[in-house]
Structure formats: C-alpha cells, structure tokens
Amino acid sequence: MSVVLDWSLIDDLRRAIARGRALPEVFGDVALGAAFELACACEAGDAALRDAVTRWSIASGVLRSSVRALAGHASPVPDPFGVPTSEIRPAPRDGRDMDDHLWTEHRERFHRSLVHLAGLPARTARAVGGAYAEMADNIISHASSDGSPTRSLVGFRVSSTEFEFAVADTGRGIRASLHERPEHRRLINHVDALDAAVRGGATRRAHAAGGGFNDLHIALADLNAVLRFRTGDAALTLDGRGADRIAARSASPMMDGFQLSVVCRC
C-alpha cells in the first residue's frame, strides 16, 4: 500500500534522514505542507536529505514544484481565469508584489477553486482566501529583521473532498520576531513563542494584536480542519472545528523560518 507523506510523518522522516536510516524509495503522494517543509529543510540540509528529496521529487510533482518555487523559479503563468486543482509559487517579496496582478490572479484562482471544486460558499471562500493572503503578508512583515526578502513559497491544492493551503519561509522564525519586543523576551524556547503567537495573539508590533493568526482562526472557524504551525524546533497542531480544536505541541528537528499548512475536509 502506498504511503502518503504528510505532516504526521515529516518530523520522524527528517530524524531518520539525520541518523542515516533506510528511507522509502517513493511515496504515494506528498501533502502540500510536508512538501513545503522538506523544501525548506533542503536549504540547510545535508547531502542525504537533498538526495532523498530529489529522489521523491521524481514521482511527486508537488514536491518538485515546491523545491523550485523556494529557489525562486516561477512556474509557467496559468490561465488567469482557470480553476486549477493546485498551484505553487514563490511568495510575494514586498508590498509591491502583494499588489501585482499575478498575485491577485493567483488569489482569485484559489477562490474559484474553493467555490467550484470544494463547494465552499463564496463568502467562506473569500474569507479563507483573505486568511491565506494575510499569511503570505506575514512573511514580508516578520521573516527578516530589516525587511529584506527571504526565500519563501505559497500554494494551494483543492479537490471535491478536501483543500490544502500552505506558506513557508526560511527566515528568522517566530521567536526572533517576537523578541523585538522586550516583554516577549521571556519566551526563551520556540514552543512557547509559537503558542504565544498562534493562540495568544503575541506580536512584535507594539500597537497591534496578532491579527494574521486571528484572521486565520476566524476564516476556518466553521470548517473541519487540521492546522500545523512549525518554527525553530517546535510544532503546534490544531485539529477539529473552531474552539473545539484539539491542540498538540511537539518537538521538531531544528529548522529556520516558519511553516504553516492547513488541511480542511469538505
């Protein structure tokens, strides 16, 4: 039986690679969030990790596209008015990119796919798309200390039974971002910093709540979803619907940046 590589396997897989253990030759499929995390891990990974990802990429278009997008290679521009099942691209690098027509068209395709493929009401699809855009904007706002671009990617995958979207960067991570405010320097480990940002609304900005994650929670409130947040050596998953989602914190092999993936069951 073919194995799907998703977030539940990704940390154990990275540990196995680091320890030189035997790895699967191929996966039946690679979830979007797992592909993004592997692409980011390759940035600082050793030869064994890069070789494994190269091998798996042969059979996984999602993983192959993720590695290329993180390296800054844009895929061919799709039909602006299409309804794609998936799309992966480099994340916007600055505010001008957020206003660029290619990014706007990408967001509109995601919206159409949510409505026509996943069957979401237009209002819900618009809220999900807005949260997706907010997560992409967070990369620009928080991934580096001086506002310089960092390697990052965004993407979605949609079917009639579920949809995924993910954002990832190789920047400084949540803890370093929060430490710009003195009151957050008490958050000395990554797992506490991650929890404070995602569930507590902590932010590096003095006069703002963590609106990005709040928008995400609001957009997904009525959807049955699994959210995975990962930074430094920490991961946080929220599983379920709205306020009843079950939170689980766990250790993750150390990696720079921040990675988020969302899977919603239609």
Regions inferred by a protein language model and the residue ranges of each:
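Flexible, glycine-/charge-rich segments associated with ATP-binding catalytic modules
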Residues: M1-R21, D79-G82, R199-C266
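Amphipathic alpha-helical interaction surfaces in cytosolic regulatory modules
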Residues: V4-P78
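Long, mid-chain structured domain cores
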Residues: L49-V53, S57-G119
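Helix-loop-beta hinge of the Bergerat
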Residues: A91-L120, R175, P182-G200, I218
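Conserved ATP-binding N-box helix of the HATPase_c
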Residues: L120-V158, H217-L220
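ATP-lid-like helix-loop hinge signature
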Residues: N138-E180, A247
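Short helix/strand-bridging catalytic loops that position acidic/His residues to coordinate divalent metals
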Residues: R151-L153, H179-L187, G201-T203, G242-R249
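Compact recognition or signaling/catalytic modules
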Residues: E162, V167-D169, L178-R181, I188, ...
